[in-house]
Amino acid sequence: MKNEPKITPELVAAHGLKPDEYERILKLIGREPTFTELGIFSAMWNEHCSYKSSRIHLRGLPTKAPWVIQGPGENAGVIDIGDGQAVVFKMESHNHPSYIEPYQGATTGVGGILRDVFTMGARPIACLNALSFGAPEHAKTRHLVSGVVAGVGGYGNSFGVPTVGGQVRFHTRYDGNILVNAMAVGLADADKIFYAAASGVNMPIVYLGSKTGRDGIHGASMASAEFDDKSEEKRPTVQVGDPFAEKLLLEACLEIMEKGCVIAIQDMGAAGLTCSAVEMGAKGDLGVDLDLDAVPTRETGMSAYEMMLSESQERMLMVLKPEKEKEAEAIFKKWGLDFAVVGYTTPSKRFVVKHGGDVMADLPIKELGDEAPLYDRPHVPSAALPVVHAREVMAPMGVGSALEKLIGTPDMCSKRWVWEQYDHVILGNTMQRPGGDAAVVRVQDGPKGLALTVDVTPRYCEADPFEGGKQAVAEAWRNITAVGGKPLAITDNLNFGNPERPEIMGQFVGCLKGISEACRTLDFPVVSGNVSLYNETNGRAILPTPSIGGVGLLDDFTKSASLAFKAEGEAILLIGETHGWLGQSVYLRDICGREEGAPPPVDLAAEKRNGDCVRGMIHAGTATAVHDLSDGGLLIALAEMAMASGIGAKLLAAPTSLVSQAYWFGEDQARYLVTVPETEAGRVLAKMRGCEVPCVRIGTTGGDAIAIAGEAPVTIDKLRTSFERWLPEYMGGKAA
């Protein structure tokens, strides 16, 4: 058939299919597949598209709530925020491409997640990201940071959506496999959400957007395999993005949606035309006939195999109402985009692909997705690590010196160098910029605001996957709460190593159980997400990194809280219990040189109780500044509040019942720092006692330094110098 290669065991293996999976294909279709069919099965049955190793565990996630309009299974999740408005959001990874070609990998990661959001009928209003890089001293790290940050900024800035928050971390376990997790958030009318399921027989299937090229072929398969020393050879499988074409595609899609032309819509992401066409047909219980001669291409002589597996960017597939076809075509031509009828829906439940008059593929459409192998892989739980007792930890330096050093380390230092390359205020609705607990974005034409955050602590997840999974969700919940938002829902991006290794699968299962428990207890459902496995190189896996993207609602964005101290002479209150937990803390790692111990346990009932009280204080107007406590503990949080305002703090000494370093740098969970006017302090403390919420006064705002009783003060200027210095110097070429 058109000189297609002969199917051999080597060719099957090169497509990422195991021998038993190929036998399953033979049984399913009753014959040997064509080369194009082999490519289609490879695309639909790989880990990236089929979730074959994770699906049985994902079923345990809580996904429903009265405000959830659409949970997992569509292009993005959708939640109701009242007044006929909905928030559409999702996070997904572009890890493997970004390691091979950092600029293009990052740009197309942003482009892909934006398409997922506007495919649902939403106008994107914000992006966030979570970036994990190797050790600063690794030979490729500086190059990868530079390329990824430029790519994220280049696409978002050109497309015209603000990048409002995220995370950046460094760890040697990401040396050979960085993580680029991108999140997009959009607004839509709650009664005008668009879905992927086709309906009606003989409806036109229309190709929209940019032309198809050879870029990105096998991109989804690459994302389903671990790296080795030849990973650089996969550079041709990295897609190339064009943010200006995507902006045109956005406007054209929203316009034809508004005109009532669309029956179903699916963006061409992983596995391109194959996955989008199969999903539209299978979800609608229909067949699909495609004629590849009609596909707009930008390269000559493309084969059916290449066209079906290309991951060229900025493309959509739609099922249109036949009577609206001409109107839709005129809209796309107006925006300068390709519009081509490439097929029709059929009652056959077959996926038929024709090219040059030949049938290149004829497969059962439901089985391509629904009959993908499903694995319950062996998994072993991670061994419990011993608790690190604070009294057994030698303090190598004083508290002030430790603060000054810690706040200038790669993970704790300012990421201004990163976020200043992103346009975080375009559209004019960013009310709280990067650097705080959560971004706050105004919902246009009203008082409402959205609180947005991305969180995970991978070292906790490695040490105890269950507690680490809980903590990732709790941290997102706290960050939203700290700005005054009511947490509504999350999207997750689950990044792990090779699931065929029982210890890695054990990490995945443990983290997922923790995420599920936290989401259930906090009433914080999962509405969308992405699983990225095989994140390892030469057998060395990344730290388990289940990134959590959280969305919350503020009824009035003008009443949000921020972390900056507001005035001198205000009372500083610590809410939540402090035990001085040093296991897996950044203090223990970066000051004491010990990356060890059990992570802090997460008491979800305390998280809910403490957080609800803090949110109540914000809404009542009592709290003047709020900051949640996480990496680095109490003193790092205090320093961040002081640097944000230029106002210092006069602090009481650590309680004698606790080791000083553990009190100041321990990472106990469910805690917040809150400032209140001096006149309110007594009343607030009494109210907290009545609510059984642990709350103590630890000091007073004022001066130009962090001054702890009995310790040498550290000036804000000194802290700010340390905080701001490392990343610009590192990226400027100074040694790590």
From Swiss-Prot:
The active site is at 48, 94 (proton acceptor). It is found in: Cytoplasm. GO terms for biological process: 'de novo' IMP biosynthetic process; purine nucleotide biosynthetic process. The keyword Nucleotide-binding applies. Substrate binds at residues 93-96, 115, 239, 311-313, 532. One of its GO terms (cellular component) is cytoplasm. Its main location: cytoplasm. One of its GO terms (molecular function) is ATP binding. Keywords: ATP-binding, Cytoplasm, Ligase, Magnesium, Metal-binding, Nucleotide-binding, Purine biosynthesis. Mg(2+) 2 binds at residues 116, 267. It catalyses: N(2)-formyl-N(1)-(5-phospho-beta-D-ribosyl)glycinamide + L-glutamine + ATP + H2O = 2-formamido-N(1)-(5-O-phospho-beta-D-ribosyl)acetamidine + L-glutamate + ADP + phosphate + H(+). It is an enzyme of class 6 (ligase). It holds the Pfam family AIRS_C. InterPro entries: PRibForGlyAmidine_synth_PurL (IPR010074), PurL_linker (IPR041609), PurM-like_C_dom (IPR010918), PurM-like_C_sf (IPR036676), PurM-like_N (IPR016188), PurM-like_N_sf (IPR036921). Mg(2+) 1 binds at residues 92, 530. Belongs to the FGAMS family. This is Phosphoribosylformylglycinamidine synthase subunit PurL. It comes from Bradyrhizobium diazoefficiens (strain JCM 10833 / BCRC 13528 / IAM 13628 / NBRC 14792 / USDA 110).
